[in-house]
């Protein structure tokens, strides 16, 4: 078959989008939110997720009904090691595998979300399909400080999208972090009574939601459980997702006190958000995006590792009045009690924080990223025809 006939067949098929966002939930969830938005905008779109065998995408992508193609992982060592010596070979292998995927699905555009899946995708797209055209790239950076993969991808990308204006990338368009539609469409007030009944709280309760990501956060767990008596004495109920591998040291339950509901994991974050008046959580990009999308004020406790991006992720919300920052090193039972109780017992202050949190969110981020991807893909097809 000659090149011209291949291109004609290509133009008759739905737009082919490859999403490169494997590894952690912070990369996979935005990719899946964009996939859902793409399908809503164009039911004929063909979506392929790129991932590795070791990432969460092996479970999350099939659950959401999308095709998944696996490549060799290319983790980038932070320090000199044997892995650094193996890096060039791994990169070449991953690029070759990715180019095969892009060719196999006849990709029209690659949308990358950073991490060790995105880097080979950017390089393969720039090199072009086997014997054919280059593939345009759209980069999305969720963190306030861009990682290596997105810094590389942004150099040749058609469009660079970001959660914040100062992520370290040039010529960015601020769109926020893509969040799944079940969260962005959540009406907390309408669902509150059902949500509180689900967890055993009174309809008029003051509810603190505590979570530290899918695996929990031990420092948050220790501090909030140490404040349990003070919170109960102030009439505050607690919904605490402590992580499947963690336990809490709680005082004996008092049937006369507001309930302290401790669970390993929350399958229904929508109900948890609807039940809550205030949250204590980490400040990963995805967490901040979800919490602000639903308009929930929060006390953010940045993870004290990495390059400080979690603190930067929360700063815009905190500066706008939608949250507070507490350093992990300063977290204790006393800190929790002194911070939470004045907030949850002051209606006007809580209402102001709730309003500010709502204004800080970007509930249309997934749709905006999807629109850009389709625009770039259609322009590339038109140019090639």
UniProtKB/Swiss-Prot annotation:
It catalyses: di-trans,octa-cis-undecaprenyl diphospho-N-acetyl-alpha-D-muramoyl-L-alanyl-D-glutamyl-meso-2,6-diaminopimeloyl-D-alanyl-D-alanine + UDP-N-acetyl-alpha-D-glucosamine = di-trans,octa-cis-undecaprenyl diphospho-[N-acetyl-alpha-D-glucosaminyl-(1->4)]-N-acetyl-alpha-D-muramoyl-L-alanyl-D-glutamyl-meso-2,6-diaminopimeloyl-D-alanyl-D-alanine + UDP + H(+). It is a peripheral membrane protein. SUPFAM superfamilies: UDP-Glycosyltransferase/glycogen phosphorylase. It is found in: Cell membrane. Pathway: Cell wall biogenesis; peptidoglycan biosynthesis. UDP-N-acetyl-alpha-D-glucosamine binds at residues 24-26, 143, 180, 214, 310. GO terms for cellular component: plasma membrane. It comes from the Bacteria. Its EC number is 2.4.1.227. InterPro entries: GlcNAc_MurG, Glyco_trans_28_C, GlycoTrans_28_N. Keywords: Cell cycle, Cell division, Cell membrane, Cell shape, Cell wall biogenesis/degradation, Glycosyltransferase, Membrane, Peptidoglycan synthesis, Transferase. GO terms for biological process: carbohydrate metabolic process; cell division; cell wall organization; lipid glycosylation; peptidoglycan biosynthetic process; regulation of cell shape. Pfam families: Glyco_tran_28_C, Glyco_transf_28. One of its GO terms (molecular function) is undecaprenyldiphospho-muramoylpentapeptide beta-N-acetylglucosaminyltransferase activity. Its main location: membrane. Cell wall formation. Catalyzes the transfer of a GlcNAc subunit on undecaprenyl-pyrophosphoryl-MurNAc-pentapeptide (lipid intermediate I) to form undecaprenyl-pyrophosphoryl-MurNAc-(pentapeptide)GlcNAc (lipid intermediate II). HAMAP family: MurG. Belongs to the glycosyltransferase 28 family. MurG subfamily. NCBIfam families: murG. This is UDP-N-acetylglucosamine--N-acetylmuramyl-(pentapeptide) pyrophosphoryl-undecaprenol N-acetylglucosamine transferase. It comes from Mycolicibacterium smegmatis (strain ATCC 700084 / mc(2)155).
């Amino acid at each position: 078959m000659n090149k011209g006939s291949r291109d004609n067949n290509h133009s008759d098929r739905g737009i082919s989008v490859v999403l490169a966002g494997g590894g952690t939930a912070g990369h996979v969830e935005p990719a899946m939110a964009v996939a859902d938005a793409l399908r809503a905008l164009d039911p004929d779109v063909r979506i392929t997720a790129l991932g590795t065998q070791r990432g969460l995408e092996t479970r999350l992508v099939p659950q959401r009904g999308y095709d998944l193609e696996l490549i060799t992982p290319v983790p980038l060592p932070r320090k000199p090691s044997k892995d650094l010596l193996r890096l060039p070979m791994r990169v070449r292998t991953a690029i070759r595998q990715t180019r095969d995927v892009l060719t196999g699905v006849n990709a029209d555009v690659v949308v990358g979300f950073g991490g060790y899946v995105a880097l080979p995708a950017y390089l393969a797209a720039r090199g072009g399909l086997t014997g054919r055209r280059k593939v345009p790239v759209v980069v999305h950076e969720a963190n306030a400080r861009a990682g290596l993969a997105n810094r590389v991808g942004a150099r040749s990308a058609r469009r660079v999208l970001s959660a914040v204006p100062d992520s370290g990338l040039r010529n960015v368009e601020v769109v926020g972090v893509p969040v799944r539609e079940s969260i962005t469409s959540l009406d907390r007030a309408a669902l509150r009574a059902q949500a509180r009944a689900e967890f055993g709280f009174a309809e008029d309760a003051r509810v603190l939601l505590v979570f530290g990501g899918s695996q929990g956060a031990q420092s948050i767990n220790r501090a909030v459980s140490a404040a349990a008596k003070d919170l109960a004495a102030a009439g505050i109920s607690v919904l605490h997702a402590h992580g499947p591998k963690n336990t809490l040291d709680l005082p004996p339950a008092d049937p006369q006190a507001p309930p302290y509901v401790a669970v390993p994991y929350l399958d229904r974050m929508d109900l948890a958000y609807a039940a809550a008046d205030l949250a204590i959580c980490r400040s990963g990009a995805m967490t901040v995006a979800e919490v602000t999308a639903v308009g929930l004020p929060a006390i953010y406790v940045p993870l004290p590792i990495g390059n400080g991006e979690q603190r930067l992720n929360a700063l815009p919300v905190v500066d706008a009045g939608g949250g507070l920052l507490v350093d992990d090193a300063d977290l204790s039972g006393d800190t929790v009690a002194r911070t939470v109780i004045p907030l949850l017992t002051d209606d006007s202050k809580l209402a102001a924080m709730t309003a500010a949190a709502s204004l800080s969110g970007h509930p249309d981020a997934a749709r905006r990223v999807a629109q850009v991807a389709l625009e770039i893909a259609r322009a590339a097809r038109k140019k090639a025809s």
